[in-house]
């Protein structure tokens, strides 16, 4: 699926070097097919890096995907040039009257911060409330899962004593579920979080269906039966080097982090890590776009009036 992005977005050249099909807006305008409109609320500090990761995964299906990047934090960024944010990101006020086929809410390094202490917590709640009437399907990733469970289901913040970091094995619970269609019975995916997601908590306090979990009984992938909301507690979008960058950053900060589990060959940080989750990440996002977005979204978004009820 060619993703449609602004002509000058840095990800265009970055992904073309990997032979990822990226279609600029100027080229796409000549095609008579409605692209899927996907809004990405990017909460990660290194926004360009995160854009590259998610756009790579959104590029693997047969239809156009029209990407709109959203920011809700008006503070000056220390990791992303202001010019980039001004050129490629919109504010909520710019899109609040629009409808979208899909919304992705990324993770954020806020695992040890109380919800009410998050600078943009009111804006997060506003976007989630807005999405009920303006988005066909929303995918929450890592910290965004924890935030959404609190806002939508009233589940208090669950925090691990130690950070979960590494590449972990998961198994699917419903082989014929659409979101896990084509998954291996067991698969690997990276995690980098303090948030805790016990499967029992999800089963006891929500109506969500758990589709995949870790060997330790943590929920990894779960969704509503109407496909309107889906949750992934790990980081299937991560590059091969992302966990290494986080590890060495924490080492330099004197935090004495554990070596990411099952990541560096022979558990030696001097060895170059290899991504063992790429096929899983691509299939997950392809399934979400196809079965949770494309198959149920209306052709004319002006007529969309979805509800979570």
UniProtKB/Swiss-Prot annotation:
Question: Source organism's superkingdom?
Answer: Bacteria
A single GO BP annotation from the record?
L-methionine biosynthetic process from homoserine via O-succinyl-L-homoserine and cystathionine
Key word Coiled coil present: no
List of residues binding substrate = 163, 192, 249
Matches recorded under PANTHER family: HOMOSERINE O-SUCCINYLTRANSFERASE
Species classification: Bacteria, Pseudomonadati, Pseudomonadota, Gammaproteobacteria, Enterobacterales
Catalytic reaction list:
L-homoserine + succinyl-CoA = O-succinyl-L-homoserine + CoA
Q: Does the keyword Translocase apply?
A: no
On assembly, the entry states: Homodimer.
Enzyme Commission designation: 2.3.1.46
Write down a Pfam family by its short name: HTS
Q: Where in the cell is it found?
A: Cytoplasm
The biological pathway it contributes to is: Amino-acid biosynthesis; L-methionine biosynthesis via de novo pathway; O-succinyl-L-homoserine from L-homoserine: step 1/1
Gene Ontology CC annotation, any one: cytoplasm
GO MF, one example: homoserine O-acetyltransferase activity
| Residue(s) at site: Important for acyl-CoA specificity | 111
Name used for this protein in its record: Homoserine O-succinyltransferase
Question: Which residues of this protein are catalytic?
Answer: 142 (acyl-thioester intermediate), 235 (proton acceptor), 237
* Cleavable signal peptide: none
Known InterPro entries for this protein?
Answer: Class_I_gatase-like, HST_MetA, MetA_family
Q: What does this protein do, in the record's words?
A: Transfers a succinyl group from succinyl-CoA to L-homoserine, forming succinyl-L-homoserine.
